[in-house]
């Protein structure tokens, strides 16, 4: 009996670029609940100016938004928008070096 690798019977994975776009959309929606939209627009423009409309730029934006949201939640989210009156400083949770 001839040995063969197992057949790929699992569900098809979606293409990488579609997954990146979906993750970015989810992060953007969550970030808009917590951060000033003007700040997010400025960040998006900065990334676009550096990388254009590329997966590399989307990846950098994903990393930045994940870190910002993590720090925000770690600092105690009160559903405020950082950068607006009543918003907290996300960097206050980092102990001084």
From Swiss-Prot:
GO cellular component: host cell; host cell nucleus; virion component
General function of this protein: Stimulates gene expression driven by the HIV-2 LTR. Prevents infected cells from undergoing mitosis and proliferating, by inducing arrest or delay in the G2 phase of the cell cycle. Cell cycle arrest creates a favorable environment for maximizing viral expression and production.
Stretches for region Disordered: 78-97
Subunit architecture: Interacts with human UNG.
Keyword DNA repair appears in the UniProt entry: no
Protein name: Protein Vpr
Annotated Pfam families: VPR
Source organism superkingdom: Viruses
Presence of the UniProt keyword Thylakoid in the record: no
GO biological process, one term: viral penetration into host nucleus
Miscellaneous comment as given in the Swiss-Prot or TrEMBL entry: This is a macaque isolate.
Gene3D superfamilies: 6.10.210.10, VpR/VpX protein, C-terminal domain
Residue list for modification Phosphoserine: 80
UniProt lineage: Viruses, Riboviria, Pararnavirae, Artverviricota, Revtraviricetes
Subcellular location: Virion; Host nucleus
Keyword entries, A-Z: Activator, AIDS, Cell cycle, Host nucleus, Host-virus interaction, Phosphoprotein, Transcription, Transcription regulation, Viral penetration into host nucleus, Virion, Virus entry into host cell
């Amino acid at each position: 009996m001839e040995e063969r690798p197992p057949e790929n019977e699992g569900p098809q994975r979606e293409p990488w670029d579609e997954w990146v776009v979906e993750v970015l959309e989810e992060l953007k929606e969550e970030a808009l609940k917590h951060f000033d939209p003007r700040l997010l627009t400025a960040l998006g423009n900065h990334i676009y100016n550096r990388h254009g409309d590329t997966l590399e730029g989307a990846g950098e934006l994903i990393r930045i938004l994940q870190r910002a949201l993590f720090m925000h939640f770690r600092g105690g989210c009160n559903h405020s928008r950082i950068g607006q009156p009543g918003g907290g400083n996300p960097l206050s949770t980092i102990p001084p070096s």
